[in-house]
């Protein structure tokens, strides 16, 4: 390799490393109801926005609940498994994020220190879709499970 090619090789290497390290979850995700398995009692539509912030990731949920009423909730945290306060939802007062790998992370919702709903998210290799597998209990204490299919906008 000649002296002119070395800087190019270093630049390409740094670009590839940065691209690989990028968080595939960042951006706006919209629920595709027709590809999802949603039981009665869960929200009807939802858009989730993941934004990079100085101290981690800010996650905002906007949608329509089972009664047709709009909802908004969110939190800011990191993928460290620690609990972070959440506002705007009856099923949780805290959430934690834990990254399994570049394409898989888990969210645990807690109310009063007890787990309510756990969601395992798997993002497709192309980063354009992801599936969330929900399990746990509703705000009323009833068991619930669902499979949500999201598309990146």
How would you label these PLM feature ranges?
Residues 1-7:
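Positively charged n-region of N-terminal signal peptides that target proteins for export
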Residues 3, 15-16, 45:
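A detector of low-complexity, intrinsically disordered, Ser/Thr/Gly/Pro/Ala-rich segments
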Residues 7-17:
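Bacterial N-terminal signal peptides
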Residues 21-153:
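Hydrophobic small-molecule pocket/channel-lining residues, especially in calycin-type beta-barrels
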């Amino acid at each position: 390799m000649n002296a002119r090619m070395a800087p190019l090789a270093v630049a390409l290497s740094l670009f590839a490393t940065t691209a690989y390290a990028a968080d595939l979850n960042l951006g706006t995700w919209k629920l595709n109801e027709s590809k999802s398995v949603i039981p009665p009692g869960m929200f009807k539509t939802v858009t989730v926005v993941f934004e990079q912030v100085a101290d981690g990731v800010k996650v905002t949920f906007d949608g329509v609940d089972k009664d047709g009423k709009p909802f908004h909730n969110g939190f800011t945290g990191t993928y460290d498994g620690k609990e972070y306060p959440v506002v705007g939802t009856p099923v949780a007062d805290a959430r934690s994020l834990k990254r399994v790998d570049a394409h898989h992370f888990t969210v645990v919702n807690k109310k009063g220190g007890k787990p309510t709903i756990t969601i395992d998210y798997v993002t497709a290799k192309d980063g354009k879709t992801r599936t969330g597998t929900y399990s746990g209990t509703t705000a009323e204490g009833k068991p619930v499970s669902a499979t949500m299919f999201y598309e990146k906008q």
